[in-house]
Swiss-Prot record:
InterPro entries: AcrB_DN_DC_subdom, Acrflvin-R, Multidrug-R_MdtB. The MdtABC tripartite complex confers resistance against novobiocin and deoxycholate. It is a multi-pass membrane protein. This is Multidrug resistance protein MdtB. It is found in: Cell inner membrane. The gene is mdtB.
Length: 1040
């Protein structure tokens, strides 16, 4: 048994060194808790930071954009505008569809928002059109969030109407019930219906009108209560043949009598089973299909939701006929899993590299095993805390753990190195452990709390970016805290049991060679340091130059928001001339599909044409291009997009806009390109004046590409100019005119067929095959007050005009969105500045306001707060260090190392061609915490040497630098190698991880070289300043 000197207290580590069994069991408990926590943690791409978002869709077939705006959208907007917690309200009113997107404050629970939306819809019900086929429908989903899964349902033997009916009743409803699913949309528009196509000439010859037919159909098909008979002994429920279920029954319907002979519907119309809306279509690759897009609720876990869908699919497909095929075209979780797996691999690689560095420096297997236990234990223990905080395993938390690999090993290295030094001097292992751990305990606490202080400002970042990095910061802080605990408990205990003079002195050829190499390096460093200390002002000028250089680099480096990820899915919008019909657009879409599917990187394609909740007009089509896995294609998504756009440019009459889907979705509307800029006015006339002028200037800017606008005011309109006097004389009202037009051309839903499983519509329209275009208006007939039939042309003139294809609002005012991409040789910061400069040259009137939207707006907000964030991190660290050292001066000495890290990080980013984005900024903030460790280790030992050995400040700092050179170099290389796998990552999601690694590696290299020389010089300068200040105060006191 070793006899311990009385001074060998060991500080806070003594209890754990002396009780190895208790310490071991405590560490086993941390390990088990972490393993259990890891298995319980959900997996996602990023932390769940979605805004509470609700979409309200109202369909009114046949209504123009102007009617939809005034009769549907505006009443709803007025009610929604009164809700508390509403952050932004945007709407899009197009032909037959109104879509309102409500984005609420991050602090408002989605369920509370849902209740408010339902109450507002109820309040607006009486203000909406009485013939609205269906009330407004809301869904808890962000329309700009790409679907988590896309499925295509096809059949070679069944019509699409039957396929959609089965999908809607048997598949979509079941998927909608899965927890986390926000909305299941069916694209393809093939809902079954009975279509009644009136022969205008036939009903005119019989003296009938479309209104006569509509009234007859409506009255012949009803489904209402009839009562029951309650007799003395039996009760009988009343029923009747009041419903018609098939097209054949409708053909036989008598709509009128002439000369005693019945006129049946089949005599004046073509009645057939068909689709409810014939102007909708969807395709999977080149095959017509029903496409199911599954979107998640904001905040729902994407992995567990997708897994639940996958588990249910076999059961659902078994309920369908064998000729019906269900294909999963895209699953976002495939890339998310691959990205998380790559990050996990990089984490393991970082651990292996760090352990290798430890062996290289310590040259001793027992000494290497000790931190080899400490590093994984600290990281695994973090998972237990993550579970209690409702975190997930995602790219950011795994990045935090990967970076933490270099952090957490520092503490263990510092402890082992200090204990080993005493063992090599001849101390017994137990005594050395107690003495070394006690001596280094304060340093470990200083390192830990000063590093955590750097992370505190991240917790106070505002808006969605702050929420995004909350998990990153807390995960890293927890890992650092656990590391400190392990380093003060397990590490010294293992050193006392595993290290000995024999094991440390035992050398092989490698250890002897490396020892000589390190001795030569330390000797060279000592000579260089002596020269530097003899020329302090030159060194100080270098330090000041790095500060100036860091500011200049900060100003000139290209700035961005969030790295553009390659998730293997591309969203696209196909734009054709504004007067394009559905048939024309469908043909163009097929031409484009042929071109896209020839690209070797494309795996599948879904496309949609028609007006619904996601597509505003007939002249546009939505595309989703699913790429092959990254390891099966040669190019990343940006090169694929450029290649596809070049190929599609050869298709005449269409423009294709493409953008890669991203894990982080801040936008609330589906835009054509990545970034948005809005013009908002009090009237549409103001927009029609200024939007074209601004577009012309923006399209000339080299900083922008793919500039487009959703302002489309050249849609063809047949304006029916009714002579009201003539109409009134004949007893014809404007309501009669509107009804006649709606009956003929609005695909009017006039009746409902009820079944046990679903409801189907009866659609009324004119058969216009023989009278295309404006000539069809000549066939319209109206009934006068005396029962006569009056041609529409006798009381109205038809004028062709232009009008908007859709009317968009932002917070109830007209708005247009200009979308743009950023070319490869420019940054988002360049594009934003160019737009702002262009706007100033236009001198826009006061009634027009401009604003960036989505990720561009978030970029502006993040850029504005970045400098304050870094300042806050520095101030927080100064306060913590000042408290720990009870000094105003020493924290400044420690913080003087920071400019060198900034210069290294910014230079590395510029050399690598990376932007200074949010991820890179987080790396710079972490560097603030890392590089000051070098100064802390030097200053701690210098102060101890001055205090305990009576050394002069110069001798003390010189000895401290030589004494701590090896652990400083070791810890810096460990942190560098912890970040290296992130810098070199090439797999799925590498774009997200690489800026963090580049910035940290560059900052660590430059700071390591410079701070070894600048820190001791600044330490001595501040020491002289302190002495001078004290002497001045002393002189003043003597004179007083």
């Amino acid at each position: 048994m070793q006899v311990l000197p009385p001074s060998s207290t060991g500080g806070p580590s003594r209890l754990f060194i002396m009780r190895p069994v208790a310490t071991t069991l405590l560490m086993v408990a941390i390990l088990l808790a972490g393993i259990i926590g890891y298995r319980a943690l959900p997996v996602s791409a990023l932390p769940e930071v979605d805004y509470p978002t609700i979409q309200v869709v109202t369909l009114y077939p046949g209504a123009s954009p102007d009617v939809m705006t005034s009769a549907v959208t505006a009443p709803l907007e007025r009610q929604f505008g009164q809700m508390s917690g509403l952050k932004q309200m945007s709407s899009q009113s197009s032909g037959g569809a109104s879509v309102i997107t409500l984005q609420f404050q991050l602090t408002l629970p989605l369920d509370v928002a849902e209740q408010e939306v339902q109450a507002a819809i109820n309040a607006a019900t009486n203000l909406l059109p009485s013939d609205l086929p269906n009330p407004p429908v809301y869904s808890k989903v962000n329309p700009a969030d790409p679907p988590i899964m896309t499925l295509a349902v096809t059949s070679t033997a069944m019509p699409m109407t039957q396929v959609e009916d089965m999908v809607e009743t048997r598949v979509a409803q079941k998927i909608s019930q899965i927890s986390g699913v926000g909305l299941v949309t069916l694209s393809g528009g093939q809902r079954p219906a009975v279509r009644v196509k009136l022969n205008a000439q036939a009903i005119a010859a019989l003296g009938l009108t479309s209104e006569t037919v509509r009234t007859a159909i409506t009255g012949a098909n009803v489904n209402s209560a009839k009562g029951s008979l309650d007799g003395p002994s039996r009760a009988v429920t009343l029923s009747a043949n009041d419903q018609m279920q098939s097209a054949e029954e409708y053909r036989q319907l008598i709509i009128a009598y002439q000369n005693g002979a019945p006129i049946r519907l089949g005599d004046v119309a073509t009645v057939e089973q068909g689709a409810e809306n014939s102007w909708l279509g969807a395709w999977a690759n080149k095959e017509q299909a029903i496409v199911m897009n599954v979107q998640r609720q904001p905040g729902a876990n994407i992995i567990s939701t997708a897994d639940s869908i996958r588990q249910m699919l076999p059961q659902l497909t078994e309920s369908l006929p064998k000729s019906v095929k269900v294909t999963v075209l895209s699953d976002r979780t495939t890339n998310i899993r691959a990205s998380v797996n790559d990050t996990q691999f990089e984490l393991m690689m970082a651990i292996a590299l760090v352990v290798m560095i430890i062996y290289l420096f310590l040259r001793n297997i027992p000494a290497t095993i000790i931190p080899g236990f400490a590093v994984p234990l600290s990281l695994i223990g973090t998972f237990a805390v993550m579970v209690f905080l409702d975190f997930s395993i995602n790219n950011l938390t795994l990045m935090a753990l990967t970076i933490a690999t270099g952090f957490v090993v520092d503490d263990a290295i510092v402890v082992i190195e200090n204990i080993s030094r005493y063992i090599e001097k001849g101390e017994k292992p137990l005594a050395a452990a107690l003495k070394g751990a006690g001596e280094i305990g304060f340093t470990i606490i200083s390192l830990t709390f000063s590093l955590i202080a750097v992370l505190i400002p991240l917790l106070f970042m505002g808006d969605i970016v702050g929420r995004l990095f909350r998990e990153f910061a807390i995960t890293l802080a927890v890992a650092i805290l656990i590391s400190a605990v392990v380093s003060l408990t397990l590490t010294p205990m293992m050193c006392a049991r595993m290290l000995s003079q024999e094991s440390l002195r035992k050398q092989n050829r490698f250890s002897r060679a490396s020892e000589k190499m390190f001795d030569r390096i330390i000797a060279a460093y000592g000579r260089g340091l002596a020269k530097v200390l003899n020329h302090p002002w030159l060194t100080l000028s270098v330090a000041l130059s790095t500060l100036l250089l860091s500011v200049l680099l900060w100003v000139f480096i290209p700035k961005g928001f969030f790295p553009v990820q390659d998730n293997g899915i591309i969203q696209g919008t196909l734009q054709a001339p504004q007067s394009s019909s559905f048939a024309n657009m469908a043909q163009r879409q097929r031409q484009v599909a042929d071109v896209i599917l020839q690209d070797p990187a494309v795996q599948s394609l879904t496309s949609f044409v028609g007006v619904d909740g996601t597509n505003p007009s007939l002249n546009s089509a939505r595309l989703q291009i699913n790429l092959k896995p990254l390891d099966e294609r040669d190019d990343r998504v940006q090169k694929v997009i450029a290649r596809l756009q070049t190929a599609v440019d050869k298709v005449p009459g269409v423009d294709l806009f493409l953008q890669p889907t991203q894990d982080l979705t801040i936008d609330t509307q589906v835009s054509r390109t990545q970034y948005q800029f809005t013009l908002q006015a009090t009237s549409l006339d103001a927009l029609s004046t200024w939007v074209p002028e601004l577009m012309e200037k923006l399209q000339q800017l080299p900083q922008l590409s793919d500039v487009s606008s959703d302002w489309q005011d050249k849609g063809l309109v047949a304006y029916v100019n009714v002579d009201r006097d003539s109409a009134s004389r004949l007893g014809i009202s404007m309501a009669d005119v509107d009804n006649a037009l709606y009956n003929a051309f609005g695909q009017r839903l006039i009746s409902t067929i009820y079944t046990q499983a679903n409801q189907y519509r009866v659609v009324l329209e004119h058969n216009t095959e023989n009278t295309p275009g404006l000539a069809a208006l000549d066939t319209i007939r109206l009934t006068s007050s005396d029962g006569g039939v009056v041609p529409l042309s006798s009381i109205a003139k038809i004028e062709q005009r232009f009008a908007p294809l859709s009317i968009n609002h932002l917070d109830q005012f007209p708005v247009t969105t200009i979308s743009f991409n950023v070319p490869d040789n420019y940054s988002l910061g360049d594009a934003v500045q160019a737009i702002m400069d262009t706007e100033k040259t236009l001198n826009l009137p006061v009634d027009i306001t401009t604003q960036f939207q989505g990720s561009t707006l978030a970029f502006q907000s993040a850029l504005g707060s970045t400098v304050w964030l870094i300042v806050a991190a520095v101030v927080a660290m100064y306060i913590v260090l000042g408290i720990l050292y009870e000094s105003f001066i020493h924290p400044i000495t420690i913080l003087s190392t920071l400019p060198t890290a900034g210069v290294g990080a910014l230079l590395a980013l510029m050399i690598a061609g990376s932007e200074l984005d949010v991820i890179a900024i987080i790396g710079i903030i972490l560097l603030i915490g890392i590089v000051k460790k070098n100064a802390i280790m030097m200053i701690d030992f210098a102060l101890a040497a001055e205090r305990e050995q009576g050394m002069s400040p110069r001798d003390a700092i010189y000895q401290a630098c030589l004494l701590r050179f090896r652990p400083i170099l070791m810890t810096t290389l460990a942190a560098l190698l912890g970040a290296l796998p992130l810098m070199l990552s090439t797999g799925v999601g590498a774009e997200l991880r690489r800026p963090l690694g580049i910035g940290m590696v560059g900052g660590l290299i430059v700071s390591q070289v410079l701070t070894l020389f600048t820190t001791p010089v600044i330490y001595l300068l501040f020491d002289r300043l302190a002495l001078w200040t004290k002497s001045r105060f002393a002189r003043h006191e003597e004179e007083a």
